[in-house]
Each structure stands twice: as C-alpha cells, then as structure tokens.
Amino acid sequence: MGLLTSLKDSISRVTEGLFASGEPKRIGIYGPPNAGKTTLANRIARDWTGDAVGPESHIPHETRRARRKEDVTIERNGKEVTIDIVDTPGVTTKVDYEEFLEHDMEKEDAVRRSREATEGVAEAMHWLREDVEGVIYVLDATQDPFTQVNTMLIGIIESQDLPVLILANKIDKEEADIQQIANAFPQHETIPLSALEGDNMDEVYEKIAEYFS
C-alpha cells in the first residue's frame, strides 16, 4: 500500500507540473499607428529568441495584419513567463489614403494600403475581444495620449479584466514627455522605454514577467 501511495504521489506531482506550465499566454501589443509596436515586438523577440516578428517602417500602418511570435520565454528576478507575442495593426478611427500619398506612394498603392489598414483595425479589435490574455499598450511619448482611440481601447481592456502594461515609447527623443502619459492613465503604471535603442528594456522585461506570469 505504501508503494502504491508513493507512486500515486509521484504521478500527481508530475501531472501538476505539466498543467502548471500550461500554454503560453497570448499577449497583444496594441496602440496607435507608428507608436513603435513592431519595433518593440522585434526587440523582445530578438532578445529572447534571436528572431524578428516583422518589418518596421516610418510609414503609418506598416503592420496591417496581426503577426504572432510563439513561445517567447522571459526570465527576470526569479520569475519566468512564456508568451506568444501578437503584434497587432495600429488602431485608429480613420484611415485616409491621402495620408500615404504624403510618403510618395502612387494613388493605387495608397488606396490599397488604406483598405488593408482598415481591415487590420478590425482584426486587431477581434483579437482584443476574443483571443488575447493580456495587453502591452505602446504609446509614443512625443504625442498627446488623450485621444478617443486610446481612451476607448484602454476602456475595453479594463472591461475585460485583462492585465495591461502601458509603455511610454521613444524616450530617446528630446520632445518625449513621459508624465503626460502617466497623467492620461493614472490608474495604470507607466514604464518608459526606447524600443529602438533598447533603453530601459530590463525594467520592461521585469514588468512583463510580473504582470503576465
């Protein structure tokens, strides 16, 4: 009987360990266009897997379909979390093809890009409502965060009780104002960083491990 009990205990411990590890958590990277979402996704993926998620560009709506990088394991301060990064298209209330003409695009290409960007917004919202288990919300610290889109998205995230980490990106720029982002969403902690330069990424990784583990 003692041997049987010991065997059951051993099996139980192994089973608990397997279920404790679970599936990687799907963490969506959200924010307005050109906030640096893909730059951040690539920074995280390269730091922990050596691979990139997708191309980066100064032209708005470079990411027009959600891209996923699976099984990214982040370790900090004794905590470990494995996540699937979902780099989502920038969310906005209006996509105008004329915006792309300013970047020397032909009209046909600009119209196509604006259509794809609009579809990308819908896809990003679907991921938010149905599939992600946590959110990294990226804001450009050189821009005013008090916008309809930011307020709406943060409200949706909160209504779904999703853990959210707000990042004030582009602190490498002289005009960056971290405090305006902290003031816009005082109910959440704001972490400054430069995804492009890698500034303060250690703290970002600490918070990812803390928020999503």
Question: Which residues make up each language-model segment?
Answer:
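A solvent-exposed, charged loop/short amphipathic helix patch at secondary-structure junctions
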Residues: 99-114
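Conserved P-loop NTPase architecture
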Residues: 1-19, 24-28, 33, 146-147, ...
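Conserved G1/Walker A P-loop phosphate-binding module
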Residues: 2-103
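Charged, alpha-helix-enriched surfaces in structured cytosolic catalytic cores
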Residues: 35, 39, 64, 148, ...
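Conserved nucleotide-binding/hydrolysis micro-motifs of P-loop NTPases
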Residues: 62, 90-92, 142-144, 170-174, ...
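Canonical P-loop GTPase G-domain recognition
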Residues: 170-213
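Conserved C-terminal guanine-recognition region of P-loop GTPase G domains, centered on the G4
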Residues: 112-188
